[in-house]
Regions:
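A short core secondary-structure module
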Residues: 133, 150-183, 187
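Conserved hydrophobic/aromatic beta-strand scaffold that supports enzyme active sites
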Residues: 135-137, 162-166, 175-177, 196-203, ...
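Internal glycine-rich alpha/beta core junctions
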Residues: 191-218, 246
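Cytochrome P450 C-terminal beta-domain/meander region
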Residues: 132-148
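Helix-loop "lid/cap" segments that line or gate small-molecule binding pockets
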Residues: 92-101
Length: 316
C-alpha cells in the first residue's frame, strides 16, 4: 500500500519547515523558557501564509483541506517545539463549530480564526474523570443561560477572545462560548511551562445564541471534540517523536566509544530501530484516525485508544 503524501501536502510540510526552522531555533525558543510561552509574531506569520486555515472550508476563508492536512501543521509544531498552543483554537473551537453549527454568528468565528484571532476551550474539570458528563451546570432562564462551574488545563485562556465550555443542563450536554472577561482565570504551573489556566465560572449569564450546536446534539458535538482533540495532540506527539528519532540518529552516527561509532553497536542500533518503528506506527495510526474522522465524523473509541496507546509507547 502507498502511504506517501500528495504533492500539495508535501509542499505544505516543506513550507512549514522553512518558517519554523527560522522562527523556532534554539536561540528563539530560549526567549520563552521563563516567560509566557506564546509567540504572537509566529502566530501572525502562520495566519498571513494561510496555515491557520488548514482544515477549514474555503467559504470561511480557509484553504479547504481536511483533517489530515491540519495534522501536518500540528506535527510540525511538535517537531520544532513551537511556542504555540493551538489545539483549543484550531481543533476544539474551529472544527466543532464547522461541523455542528449552522448560525452565521458562529461561522464568522471561523473567518476570524483564519485571520489569527484566538479562541480556546475549557473541557476538563477537577475531580471528574468523565469529560462526557460535565460537572459544570447551566440553567435556562427564559432566553438566557446561567452557568456555574470550574474548569482547568485551558490553554492560552488569558489571550483568547472566548472560551468554549462543556456544561450539563436540563436539555443534556451543551457546548457554549463564554467571553474570557466573564470568568476568573488563574495560571497553573506545568513542567513544560505551557500557558494553561484554571477557569472559574461564577453566575455567568449567556444568551442562548452562545450554544454552538443544534438542539439535542451537544453530547455528539462533545464526543467529536474529544476525539479530534486526542488525534491532533497525537500528531504533536508524532512531531516530537520524529525530532527525538532524528537526534538519536545524529548522535549515534557521530559519537565514538572504544574507537568505534556507537551506532555500529548492536544494542544501540536495535534500540534506534525500535524508536523508528514506533515512530512509523504512530504516523500510520494517526493517518488512519484522521481519515476515519473525515469519512465517518466520529471514529471508534477502540481506534482512539489505539492512537493514544501508541503515542504513549512512542513517547517512552
Amino acid at each position: 500500500m502507498d502511504f506517501s503524501e500528495l504533492d500539495y501536502q508535501a509542499k505544505v510540510r516543506d513550507s512549514l519547515n522553512k518558517i519554523l526552522t527560522d522562527k523556532c531555533s534554539q536561540d528563539e525558543l530560549k526567549n520563552f523558557d521563563d516567560g509566557f510561552k506564546h509567540d504572537d509574531a509566529l502566530l501572525s506569520l502562520l495566519a498571513e501564509n494561510g496555515y491557520l486555515g488548514l482544515g477549514i472550508n474555503e467559504k470561511f476563508g480557509g484553504s479547504g483541506e481536511d483533517l489530515y492536512d491540519l495534522g501536518i501543521l500540528f506535527e510540525r509544531l511538535g517537531y520544532y517545539a513551537a511556542p504555540l498552543s493551538l489545539t483549543g483554537c484550531l481543533v476544539d473551537v474551529a472544527q466543532t463549530i464547522q461541523k455542528f453549527s449552522e448560525t452565521e454568528t458562529h461561522k464568522s468565528i471561523l473567518k476570524s480564526i483564519v485571520k489569527g484571532e484566538l479562541y480556546t476551550s475549557a473541557i476538563l474539570e477537577p475531580n471528574n474523570q468523565d469529560p462526557e458528563n460535565p460537572i459544570t451546570k447551566a440553567k435556562f432562564n427564559g432566553d438566557k443561560i446561567l452557568v456555574n462551574g470550574v474548569k482547568y488545563l485551558s490553554e492560552i485562556a488569558s489571550v483568547a477572545k472566548s472560551i468554549l465550555v462543556s456544561v450539563s443542563s436540563d436539555e443534556g450536554v451543551l457546548l457554549v462560548l463564554i467571553d474570557k472577561d466573564k470568568v476568573k482565570l488563574t495560571p497553573l504551573a506545568s513542567t513544560a511551562n505551557s500557558p494553561i489556566f484554571k477557569v472559574e465560572i461564577n453566575d455567568v449569564t449567556l444568551d442562548q445564541s452562545s450554544i454552538i450546536h443544534e438542539k439535542g446534539r451537544g453530547l455528539e458535538a462533545l464526543r467529536y471534540l474529544l476525539q479530534i482533540n486526542m488525534v491532533m495532540r497525537s500528531y504533536i506527539a508524532l512531531g516530537v517523536a520524529e525530532k527525538m528519532t532524528a537526534l538519536i540518529a545524529s548522535y549515534t552516527s557521530e559519537r565514538e566509544q572504544f574507537g568505534r561509532v556507537i551506532g555500529t553497536f548492536q544494542a544501540v542500533s536495535h534500540r534506534a530501530a525500535d524508536c523508528f518503528i514506533e515512530l512509523e506506527c504512530l504516523r500510520l495510526v494517526n493517518q488512519q484516525a484522521s481519515v476515519n474522522l473525515i469519512l465517518e465524523g466520529i471514529t471508534s473509541s477502540e481506534e482512539i485508544i489505539r492512537v493514544n496507546n501508541i503515542k504513549e509507547d512512542a513517547s517512552i
